[in-house]
Amino acid sequence: MASPVSPFAWIALIPIYFYRWFISPLIGPRCRFTPTCSLYAIEALKAHGFVKGCWLSGKRLLKCHPLNEGGFDPVPPVQKQDRDK
């Protein structure tokens, strides 16, 4: 079962959903990646929480430009913390 989404992650999701519902339909598809950058950000925030989700989303947005070919780039799976190492 997935862990619940933190309140900070929910706050970070608000502008992403606003973009997906209101801005993206006006400008059309522009993302070079699958899943799209906004969907990637939603998945990253829900899976990894606020801090790591924002970090992963920011890295992804920096890669989304005309000089990058894009392609399939899924959100990395959640790693269990190994405290013995």
From Swiss-Prot:
Localization terms from the record: Cell inner membrane
Domain of life from the UniProt record: Bacteria
Primary location class: membrane
Keyword Cell membrane: yes
Keyword Translocase: no
GO cellular component labels: plasma membrane
Cross-referenced InterPro entries: Membr_insert_effic_factor_YidD
Membrane topology, from the record: Peripheral membrane protein
Record keywords, A-Z: Cell inner membrane, Cell membrane, Membrane
Family: Belongs to the UPF0161 family.
Primary role: Could be involved in insertion of integral membrane proteins into the membrane.
Protein name: Putative membrane protein insertion efficiency factor
The organism of origin for this protein: Vibrio atlanticus (strain LGP32)
